[in-house]
Amino acid sequence: MLYSMNLQKLTGRHTSFWLLLAMVCGTLPAAGNVPAEVDPDYEDSVVMIMAVHQEYDYTTPWKKGSMGRGLGSGFVIEGGRILTNAHNVANQRYIEVKKQNFARRYPARVEFVGHDCDLAVLSVADPSFFMGTKAVEFGGIPTINSTVQTCGFPMGGRQISITEGVVSRLETSVYSHSQAARHLV
């Protein structure tokens, strides 16, 4: 199931926020020349995920695959957890999370992962990480022609990116991460 968030409280405008688009940070056309902003109450709730991963070599399992690292986006949700994409933490060896404009990184661990829907839930043992954050609220699926906003750290960017656009189509498709099921995208 795809979740979205109503950002009426975040921006003071009636907009819907499509969480999956935000985490993947697909590009949407800019809505005018006004820069998009997120309510300061939620600014620290969008976090950077840094993962060290190691691919498995299924043909020679006694050999370790090469190590790599990646960056992604996540969002603080209720229960002191972070929602992110499964592909951000797949084959992970070590995960850290960081809030925007903060230097400190916090170790995180995978609590749940759903590769078929490309979603994962992370936990952070240190409760100080969640100070100043507010759990993002889930809303319904946006309607055609509604304004949506994406925010996150796309393509390994180290600065948060916020983009607004309009929903032009809703459809189901084979999901890109697992190719195993059809989901609303």
Specify the residue positions occupied by each region the protein language model found.
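A short, polar/charged loop/turn motif at coil->beta-strand junctions and beta-hairpin connectors
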Residues: P40-S45, N91, D116, Q179-A181
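N-terminal secretory signal peptides that target proteins for export/translocation
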Residues: M1-G12
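N-terminal activation segment of mature serine protease catalytic domains
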Residues: A31-N85, Y94, T143-I144, V148
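Bacterial N-terminal signal peptides
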Residues: S16-T27
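Conserved active-site neighborhood of the chymotrypsin/trypsin-like protease fold
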Residues: E55, E78-I160, H183
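Active-site region of chymotrypsin-like
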Residues: S45-A51, Y56, T60-K63, A125-A135, ...
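Glycine-centered structural positions embedded in regular secondary structure
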Residues: G72-G74, A108, G165
